[in-house]
Amino acid sequence: ENFAGGCTPGYQRTADGRCKATF
């Protein structure tokens, strides 16, 4: 599922708009 930012599940959107792994 896509949330704000369109990151893959398990990833969080950072302040600069990129996707970072949360694990």
Curated annotation (Swiss-Prot):
Disulfide bonds join 7-19. Keywords: Cytokine, Disulfide bond. InterPro entries: GBP_PSP. It comes from the Eukaryota. GO terms for molecular function: cytokine activity. It holds the Pfam family GBP_PSP. Hemolymph. Coiled coil: none annotated. One of its GO terms (cellular component) is extracellular space. Belongs to the GBP/PSP1/paralytic peptide family. Causes rapid, rigid paralysis when injected into Lepidopteran larvae. The physiological role may be to reduce hemolymph loss following injury and promote wound healing. This is Paralytic peptide 1.
